[in-house]
């Protein structure tokens, strides 16, 4: 935004302050002299649009932020048909907090790391799936990537796995499908091949250190933005769904689907309902499993 000629900025936010970054986005837009639009997403709106998202996605996608992105696309399309988005910066320049553990993981990466949102262990999948296939393993998908990256440092391996699996298989899919459904064209300047070439040649020490992630990127941003914005701690594209889905006002549809005939074709319904009950009972870590199912 700071480097572009865009005159308008759009952002999604929530009433729950600890999940909301839209006020900081508004401050940044005001600082840059841009018109700012804020879309406040309610739990009712979130769950209501899920069928629309799944229909237009044309395949299952267990990414809770895809729903938020769809709402954002629809809101943005009300006043423009072309916009910029910042996808790619985290994967190219070391933006994810887990990248700080890269050196500690070392050579063990290839045995377990298949991306930044691995939801379930294989024994958990085996318990809930009626037709579990032990020959279809996520780590096998990542194996060729690790072969290509042989000899590179651990951070480079992690980021390349995320580029080829997460960025391509989730983020690009989400941007493409949801923008098209809303009649919006999204351009992602940070995924330009020239940007990737710079990032791929950059030593990892300029991407992540013990105190900071996305070091070089933030340092460059500080030339056009105040340091408190450029170096602000990353929250991520988070959704308050872990709170919403535990609320009986919003989770009745989830309960019905977990007991449906369709669910019974693929899952042990008692097993998945046990996961759901455990989540509602206070184990908030299970929310990703519930949403993915």
Each predicted region: which residue ranges?
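Acyl-group handling in specialized metabolite and lipid biosynthesis
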Residues: 10-16, 36-40, 62, 205, ...
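Short, solvent-exposed loop/turn segments at secondary-structure junctions
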Residues: 15-17, 44, 89-91, 98-99, ...
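A phosphate-binding catalytic loop at a beta-strand-loop-alpha-helix junction
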Residues: 1-10, 83-92, 187, 221
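Short, flexible loop segments at the rims of nucleotide/cofactor-binding pockets, characterized by
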Residues: 58-65
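Adenosyl-5′-phosphate
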Residues: 65, 78, 82-84, 111-293
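A conserved beta-strand->alpha-helix junction
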Residues: 15-56, 131-146
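A mobile, often basic/glycine-rich helix-loop segment
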Residues: 92-117
């Amino acid at each position: 935004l700071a480097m572009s000629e865009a005159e308008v900025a759009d952002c999604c936010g929530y009433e729950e302050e600890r999940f909301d970054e839209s006020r900081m986005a508004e401050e940044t837009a005001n600082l840059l002299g841009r018109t700012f639009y804020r879309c406040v997403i309610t739990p009712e709106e979130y769950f209501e649009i899920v069928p629309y998202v799944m229909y237009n996605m044309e395949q299952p996608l267990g990414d809770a932020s895809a729903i938020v992105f769809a709402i954002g696309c629809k809101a943005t399309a009300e006043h423009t048909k072309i916009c910029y988005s910042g996808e790619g910066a985290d994967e190219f320049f070391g933006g994810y907090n887990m990248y700080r553990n890269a050196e500690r993981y070392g050579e063990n990466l290839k045995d377990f790391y298949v991306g930044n949102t691995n939801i379930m262990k294989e024994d958990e999948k085996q318990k809930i799936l009626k037709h579990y296939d032990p020959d279809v393993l996520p780590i096998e998908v990542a194996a060729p990537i690790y072969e290509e990256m042989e000899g590179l440092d651990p951070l480079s391996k992690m980021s390349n796995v995320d580029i080829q699996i997460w960025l391509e298989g989730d983020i690009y899919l989400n941007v493409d499908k949801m923008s098209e459904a809303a009649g919006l064209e999204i351009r992602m300047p940070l995924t330009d091949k020239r940007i990737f070439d710079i990032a791929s040649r950059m030593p990892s020490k300029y991407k992540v250190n013990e105190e900071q992630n996305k070091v070089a990127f933030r340092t460059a941003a500080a030339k056009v933005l105040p340091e408190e914005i450029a170096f602000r701690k990353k929250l991520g594209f988070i959704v308050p769904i872990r709170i919403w889905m535990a609320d009986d006002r919003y989770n009745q549809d989830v309960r019905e689907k977990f007991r449906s005939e369709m669910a019974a074709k693929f899952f042990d319904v008692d097993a998945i309902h046990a996961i759901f009950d455990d989540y509602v009972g206070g184990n908030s870590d299970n929310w990703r499993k519930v949403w993915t199912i």
